[in-house]
Amino acid sequence: MFDRVPLYPGRVKMTPVSGQANIYDMERADKPTQAGTPLNKTTLLKDSTAALYGLTDATPDDVFVLLKRYSEANMPAGTGTLVITTVDSSGNAVGGIDVKIFRGSSVIKTVRTEEDGCIFVSLSAGNYTLSIEESVFYEISSVSVPAEVVSRGFRFINMVVSPILTGEVRFTQSTAFTVPAFVKKLKVFAVGGGGSGAASSGRNNNAPCITGASGGYTITKEISVPGEKCTITIGAGGPAIDITSSYYNGKDGGDTKLVSEKGVTVLAGRGLGGFAIDNSAYQYGAGPSGGSGGGSGAYENDEAAGGSDGGDAAKTGGTGSYRYGYGQGTTTRYFGDTNGELFSGGGGGYANGPGGNGGGTAGVYGSEYSSDAICLDATTYGAGGGAAKTYTAGKRAKSGAGYQGLLAIKWGY
């Protein structure tokens, strides 16, 4: 409820009643900046509320007496009830807010307010602290509120939150959130984790064929999940392959996804690790496909650039025959916007093939085939790592690691 806030306290306007001496109509003329909550049956005690307690023609005091008797009869000694209500700055109920209840420094319970913004919590008598953590969809005014619970009594606490009607958030770690009722639509953009490049050390005669990794797939999708809890999983980037002998495929990245509690799903698939193919016949080796394709490699000094913006990988030098990793065929830009930030470049194939946008460049084995081959890691979300190859046994071949995925949401757009 709100107090009346007058600009001119106590001012009234008196108007003579026509034909009636010394009789006046009187009205307020205080020009309130806040009209306040009127005092009537609707705001004090509705008949429907009284009926819940088996009362008719009741006053508010009748209900309070009944509540006290109920608490004494039904609450064990040493236990009280905390009544938490979450409201906006105008006093309107805001439901679906998670409130943590602390005793000392420990969280003893997390509760969620109902649609009417209220929740009843039974607790042992004592001192508590209530906290609403930072929220995606709300600005939190009541960050930390003390509350004392008394034996067989009620403690009423209002906590203030302000809805953010239009917003955009990026998630780079797995998490969960609840979509409030006022958010009718979400636009989701997801990027899968990029794979890592393949690596080879000590294998001569151009065998095996070593390729860069593909970038993670991307997806933009609109969903409607008001009131649902959504769980986000961010796909990891594939870890680098770091060896001094033999040859190994790169590691796949991880899927990035959003799943609502009713099963609505947005999934961006992982980028694949680069391929290490025992290829003594000097044939081409295909790079892996993904959001953007990974570069292939087959011959000494041949190069294959990783793909960008959902495209296939491309040959940039050398003399061999190639089949490249294919891209998804649609843009990998942020929310699919023409000028949006670019993600999910493919990794380069050896010898020094460049990566796609943010994809790792391939490692160079150097003059006389005697150098370590150290590849650059991917540097943008969802990008694949480059391949690494050295011909000398005992030399280090380290492929490029893939970069983790990303998920972003927009609402109120």
What name fits each language-model region?
Residues 125-136, 230-234:
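A short, solvent-exposed beta-strand micro-motif common in secreted/extracellular proteins
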Residues 135-163:
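Structured interaction patches on ligand/partner-binding surfaces of diverse proteins
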Residues 80-88:
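A short, amphipathic beta-strand motif
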Residues 1-69:
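Extracellular "spike/adhesin" assembly and maturation modules
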Residues 89-104:
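Short, ordered, surface-exposed loop/turn motifs in non-cytosolic proteins
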Residues 103-119:
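Short, acidic Ser/Thr/Gly-rich low-complexity loop/linker segments typical of extracellular
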Residues 116-123, 217:
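Short, surface-exposed beta-strand/beta-hairpin micro-motifs centered on an aromatic residue
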Residues 187-413:
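Low-complexity, glycine/proline-biased repetitive segments and flexible coils/loops
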